[in-house]
Regions:
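An N-terminal hydrophobic leader/cap segment in hydrolases
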Residues: 4-5, 29-85
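The alpha/beta-hydrolase serine catalytic core
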Residues: 44, 189-241
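A short loop-to-beta-strand scaffold at the N-terminal edge of the catalytic core in hydrolase folds
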Residues: 83-98
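Conserved alpha/beta-hydrolase
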Residues: 114, 121-143
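Active-site glycine-rich loops that stabilize anionic/oxyanionic intermediates
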Residues: 101, 109-112
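Conserved acidic catalytic loop of the alpha/beta-hydrolase fold
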Residues: 151-167
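Gly/Ala-rich beta-loop-alpha elbow adjacent to hydrolase catalytic centers
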Residues: 170-179
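Conserved alpha/beta-hydrolase fold motif
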Residues: 168-169, 193
């Protein structure tokens, strides 16, 4: 599986519009680094001595988003926002708002932050929209160091319920899958949607991780199963297709 190479503009009342082609995104986080080489060796040792421990490590890494440094322009945009902290689970979500008018909700991808789509904020505000962004669980300034898929999806719905009617939902990459799941299972509603650089299937992320770490299929399968078991029934890989 791979990321999609198109953008879909969606109006729930009118169905899907035609995909808008754009450059195919690169899986930039699935690259060779010294840390990756070390982890690959660790997985090899664990698989030989304790496959269960190898699967647990896979689960931990698959639910721990990478910490990407905040860029200066993102920090500046965040500092100019009306900021809020929304209670969520055992922690809180960091919320950011700019402007006034119909609400546009921005949903970032895995390992990003609320201001990742911040270049959209000034033109949207100038056009008379209120723009809301947030850091997903375990991302940016929100609580936690890890995030399960159900936490990510339900957080989108929680933010939407908090800020009120969503005129347009804009989601990127992994955030697209989570936003669609939030609509299926957590009651998220938006009049319009702009979804771009999505995944064909959420399993793609785990497949790329396994390829990078050279994981045996059994370890990957058990790691995925742990994600299901620890979601207390909220996870269903086929439903996320």
């Amino acid at each position: 599986m791979s990321p999609s190479d198109s953008c879909i503009v969606m109006n729930p009342s009118q169905g899907l519009a035609q995909p808008v082609p754009h450059a195919r995104p690169k899986a930039g986080r699935f690259v060779e680094t010294p840390t990756v080489k070390w982890l690959r060796q660790a997985f090899a040792v664990l698989h030989a001595t304790s496959p269960a421990a190898a699967a647990h490590l896979a689960y931990v890494l698959l639910t721990r988003p990478p910490r990407v440094p905040e860029r200066p322009w993102q920090a500046s945009l965040r500092e100019r926002a009306a900021q809020d902290a929304l209670p969520f689970g055992r922690g809180q979500l960091a919320l950011y708002g700019w402007g006034s008018g119909p609400t546009v909700l921005l949903v970032h991808g895995w390992g990003a932050r609320g201001t990742h789509l911040g270049k959209m904020v000034p033109p949207l505000v100038a056009a008379g929209y209120r723009v809301v962004a947030f850091d997903a669980p375990g991302h940016g300034h929100s609580s936690g160091r890890s995030a399960t898929l159900p936490q990510f999806a339900s957080a989108i719905a929680a933010v939407a319920a908090h800020v009120g009617e969503i005129h347009t939902l804009v989601a990127h990459s992994f955030g697209v899958a989570m936003a669609l799941w939030a609509q299926l299972d957590w009651g998220l509603r938006a009049r319009r949607q702009v979804l771009f650089s999505s995944l064909d299937h959420c399993k793609w992320v785990t497949e790329e991780f396994a390829r990078l770490m050279q994981l045996p299929e059994a370890v990957l399968a058990r790691g995925r199963q742990l994600m299901v078991e620890r979601s207390q029934g909220a996870m269903d890989w086929e439903r996320l297709a």
